[in-house]
Design a protein with these regions (language model features):
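Active-site activation/catalytic loop segments of kinase-like enzymes and analogous catalytic loops
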Residues: 47-57, 118-155, 168-188, 200-207
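ATP/Mg2+ or Mg2+-diphosphate-binding catalytic cores
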Residues: 179-236
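Glycan-recognition and catalytic cores of secretory/periplasmic carbohydrate-active enzymes
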Residues: 34, 39-43, 95, 100, ...
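Active-site acidic catalytic loop and adjacent metal/ATP-binding pocket
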Residues: 24, 75-122, 129-136
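ATP-binding pocket architecture of kinase catalytic cores
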Residues: 1-39, 44, 55-61, 82
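Hydrophobic packing residues in well-ordered alpha-helices of helical domains and bundles
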Residues: 10, 14-17, 42, 67-70, ...
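All-alpha amphipathic helical-bundle segments outside canonical DNA-binding/catalytic cores
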Residues: 34-40, 158-170, 195
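Secondary-structure capping and boundary motifs in well-ordered enzyme cores
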Residues: 13, 85, 90, 114-115, ...
Length: 236
């Protein structure tokens, strides 16, 4: 999928990806099959970030007060996610996990599927680490999705609220990925993904700046950019 994307073809492929995602989101919320994206998972994701990214990878180069600010902001994000409409989530619905064949979209790596917030897979798809699109183009995809779920999921969500859902999910996702990839590096000495860390941090900073209650994230993470770059330079 990722090898087919270009400015000329992006609308076509993202439309297919949206259609396939809505099929997944249309599935029955069967708790006998799918676990829930709940408080326990959110707390676990935070613990990965704090232990492996802050304490170990960055060698705890952050004041306790700054860490507390991040935790309080993370809790606000968590409340937002728990309050969102619930659907079946792939959990990592990014272009690298999509394939294209016979004018159809196929999905890989779906073993972590669960019942979770509607913005979760949209954040994976549109806040991709490897593809960057103009805001105007992304907005047209949001509007495309918004119209389709009103018809296919009988769910009416304003574009402002939909963007908020996606943004909050994307920040939480980046907390999780920073923690998870830091653990992978520390446990297995795999360095191939640490170059993604500045991209993740920049996503968190730029996205949180748009929301008054999340601005402390941006203000707290900005000074860490230099610390992170120095740490990566030492490893490489």
């Amino acid at each position: 999928y990722q090898f087919n994307l270009s400015n000329e073809k992006a609308d076509f492929y993202y439309d297919l990806a949206i259609n396939e995602l809505i099929k997944i989101q249309s599935l029955k919320l069967d708790k006998n099959i799918f676990s829930y994206f709940d408080d326990n998972l959110l707390l676990y994701n935070w613990s990965l970030f704090e232990k492996f990214f802050i304490n170990n990878f960055l060698e705890n180069k952050i004041h306790n007060q700054s860490l507390e600010i991040l935790k309080e902001s993370y809790e606000k994000i968590s409340l937002n996610l728990l309050d969102q409409p619930k659907v079946i989530c792939h959990f990592d619905y990014e272009c690298r996990n999509l394939i294209f064949k016979d004018n159809k979209t196929g999905v890989l790596d779906f073993q972590d599927a669960l019942i979770g917030p509607i913005g979760l897979d949209l954040a994976s798809l549109f806040k991709d680490l490897y593809f960057f699109w103009p805001k105007e183009k992304i907005l047209t995809w949001y509007e495309n999705y918004q119209k389709k779920i009103e018809k296919k999921l009988n769910l009416k969500v304003s574009i402002t609220k939909l963007i908020e859902y996606i943004d909050y999910c994307s920040i939480q996702r980046q907390f999780r990925i920073l923690g998870k990839l830091s653990k992978v590096y520390l446990d297995l000495n795999r360095t191939n993904r640490i170059t993604d860390f500045p991209v993740l941090l920049n996503y968190m900073i730029s996205t949180s700046e748009a929301y008054e209650e999340l601005k402390p994230i941006s203000e707290t993470l900005l000074p860490l950019k230099e610390v992170l770059n120095e740490r990566i330079a030492k490893i490489n």
